[in-house]
């Protein structure tokens, strides 16, 4: 039984003992961002004259320099926080039912703050009305997540999964890769299958990309997408500890890539997903709208859906045909949309 989250000081020796399982990959990822900031032509760090390389002027003021540093440090800080929380949760045996939502709230607050400090597009901030709509969709997304968990738990009760066969240090990356592949395939099917597109297309209606509208989803789309990932992990037989660690990273990445923030990760785009890639995914130009991975970009490379290159930005985001779905504010109509007879072709992959 997972014990309560302690109010006192944690067992530091136990924390480091379990957290070291994550130390090597997280350190590589953390340092990689800073290495890219010094080697990638797109951004070579902050020059002494107050300019961020890549042609972005930085005022000589402390605030301007702080924003420039934040553009480089924002993602490594998120990765570091994810590793710390995962390590603490594994070491102290925190209840995943508490850790996951609290961690998600922290990620949302952090990214929402970044959207104000270093926005990619200032006119992509949600309006008052959009905040209300996005809040309703977020609640519906939580309902979809709960339904997915219920269905997976029922299925696992019928089909007994295998027991964990790997040490935790190997199991965590294996769980991450397996869940990431399942998520990629489910997402791509959401675009290529005409029935699933009528669910997933609801997410692509907004003509802006930000943290808040990452929750704009059809309930059934969440059941399908999250159910596919959870069922894969359960049937393979990954331990709850490895699923928790991989899930924290996936959750952080999923909201990070959807954030309206001016952050670039350079060559790491070829390994990890980023806001740069996900804006292309939401492009109205279907020729550049690949990038179905929201955590790793490996699968986009492998299956030919990687379209990013440095400096590439979509001219507009949203639906290729805005009239093919109800507006975001028409929540009930969006939920009922899959029941209506299809009149237009789905977008291609």
Segments (PLM) and residue ranges:
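Short, hydrophobic transmembrane alpha-helix segments
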Residues: 86-98
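Alpha-helical transmembrane segments
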Residues: 95-105, 170-179
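N-terminal membrane topogenic signal
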Residues: 60-77
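Membrane-embedded catalytic scaffold of the fatty acid hydroxylase/desaturase
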Residues: 133-316
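Hydrophobic core of alpha-helical transmembrane segments in multi-pass integral membrane proteins
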Residues: 75-88, 106-112
